[in-house]
Amino acid sequence: MKKEKYVAYISTYTIGNKDQCGIKIYDVDLEKGYLTEKDQVEITNSSYITISHNQKYLYSITDFGVESYKIQKDGSLKHINNASINGMRGCYLSTDYEEKFLFVAGYHDGKITVLRLNADGSVGEITDEIYCKGMGSVAERNFRPHVNCVKMTRDNKYLCAADLGMDHVNVYRLDHVLGKLKLEDIIRSEQESAPRHLKFSKDGKILYIVHELKNYIDVYTYTNENDNPEFEKIQTISTLNDYHASSSAASALNFSADFQYLVSSNAGDNSVVVYKIDEQTGLLEKLFCLPISGDYPKDAALFPDNKHLLSLNHESNTMTFFSVDLEKGLLVMNGKEKKVASPNCAIFHKLNQ
């Protein structure tokens, strides 16, 4: 029986020439819990990447809009095309579950952009643009819209857009023919909490929202009875220990490959937190919150074997690796750190053999 093989894609805030990263591609050693550099893609400020649900294509933010790539058999990336988003550089992107549309979140201009996807994975025309409006509380990052994450519900009916400037998540109905969005609901968060990222459980019935400035995760149930989206909060849980750095910002959310665990990181506190997900209720149990031996972790992810963990440390320009015992709540540094300029997002991808 052949061993499963994976590559890891790491996006970076870099100018993307031969000396300055772009997207890094690594071979994954599951036994050692380590990454070995394989290739890199020249692209400017690839602040976030996503892989299509059919696992065929990778899409990336860039200074010039978005770039599309065909994932090759060995995990390397073949460029398809680029497309403008008619605005400032985005910070997050995702696709719908039918691979018909690409959604881009605009932190700097508070904009949501919808682009059509073609059958060959290329990005087509813009079908909708929504400039979020309003004034938030008077704070450095919370006085105007900052759309930081856009994700479809797993039933593929609604787009949820986290606005950390306005402290809420807008819920839009997607017109699957025209690619237009219509506001249906608003999930309101605590003032100055800054909802940053969101994820839906594997069955689509639970929504997790991490709040950057207040360092906690809200857990909601999601139902769509009578074609009406309803979200009910069932839990709020901190991303920090009782003892922690005075200034900290919760970062991205990542599921384990089996959807049994949820991972986040705390920039400033420089720690990673792992939760066990209750299979029946979706509630979170904090297993540990421990230091990551780097500065300002923007992303953290479990390896596909759930025995190792990777942290992307934005300010120290490093990746750090750990062995993990999830049941015992242990995290032990594993091997030397790797230098990588301004890492921001990590994705593990299983290769077809």
Task: Indicate where each model-derived feature is located.
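Short loop/turn segments immediately following the C-termini of beta-strands
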Residues: 13-15, 61-63, 107, 117, ...
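Beta-rich, blade/repeat-based domains predominating
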Residues: 17-19, 43-53, 86-97, 133-154, ...
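Short loop/turn segments immediately following beta-strands, especially the blade-tip
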Residues: 26-33, 69-76, 115-124, 172-180, ...
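A short beta-strand motif characteristic of beta-propeller blades
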Residues: 36-42, 78-84, 134-140, 182-188, ...
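Blade-loop segments of beta-propeller domains
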Residues: 37-99
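Asp-box/WD-like beta-propeller blade repeats and closely related beta-sheet repeat scaffolds
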Residues: 78-149
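Loop-centered beta-sheet repeat module
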Residues: 156-215
